[in-house]
Amino acid sequence: MSFATEVKNELCRVPLSRHCCAVAEAYGVLLYCHTFTTREIRIVTACDAFAERLPKLFRRAFGAHFVLPVTEKAGGRHVLTITDRAAIETVFAAFGADLSRTVAHHINLGVLESDCCRASFLRGAFLAGGSVTDPSKNYHLELITAHASVSREAAALLTELGFAARSIDRGANTVLYFKKSEAIEDFLTKIGAPCAAMDIMSAKVEKSMNNSINRKVNCDTANADKVVAAAQEQIDAIRRIERDYGLDVLPEKLQSAALLRIANPEASLADLAMLSYPPVTKSCLNYRLKKLTEFHMDD
């Protein structure tokens, strides 16, 4: 199950209690659904929970009934339609529209006077025309409608509620979207999906922890590579000295450091210092090993 479906399932568990909120949610559905005309209302969804909620929602809001829902075999999408003229008139009348005139869709803010109704409207819009990506991959939530005027007015409504949505045109549709995780969390909480918002927060924390671990691993790997490279340089220098002069030409302390390094080719400087007898400091041993790497060049 996709994250978007999980979000919609959670939204569909919000009770249909107040009549005004049911009307507002249905309004959001209609303005963001497949078809909303004076001849037909058609809602297409792949979400089972949303398909089950719609008949209850429209009965609560308008007393309207859908034609027997059809489930498409290809893709498993549900198609719910209303074609009865009287039912469509009832729906349009609820939003102050007159079917005898050409209908250009706009958001009637009179239907969304209270904050709970605005949240319900946005919930309906998301259920019908929204999607959100899996937060473990990236952050993106969008609302898609074929009505540019509706999208502009929805953007203004979101701004009033404290959300700054961006807008783009995608073919014949207009898209409002969020890409910041905090905005998506707040939006989902607003429309009734606080658990989904918490999932995004958890995913963000997990990402941050994984990034920290990766940075530490990369840093440790880089440090290990440096240790190996330095040790190899020292061993190469010691082998050259041994080949060209013999280690006996070295002062006792340098000879001791050379033999210690040859015997422990993968040891770090700190480990070598602890293995020295008598023990020496890291800086002291580092000085001796540096003298060894310079010995051949200076000779």
Give residue ranges: language-model regions:
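Structural motif
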Residues: 15-23, 111-118, 248-252
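Short, hydrophobic/amphipathic alpha-helical patches that form generic packing surfaces
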Residues: 24-32, 120-128, 259
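Short acidic (Asp/Glu) and glycine-rich catalytic loops that position anionic groups and cofactors
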Residues: 34-37, 134, 167, 234-239
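Short acidic, hydrophobic short linear motifs in intrinsically disordered regions
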Residues: 36-42, 136-138, 268-270
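DNA-contacting interfaces and partner/effector-binding or oligomerization modules
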Residues: 45, 52, 56-201
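Extended mid-to-C-terminal alpha-helical interaction segments
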Residues: 190-290
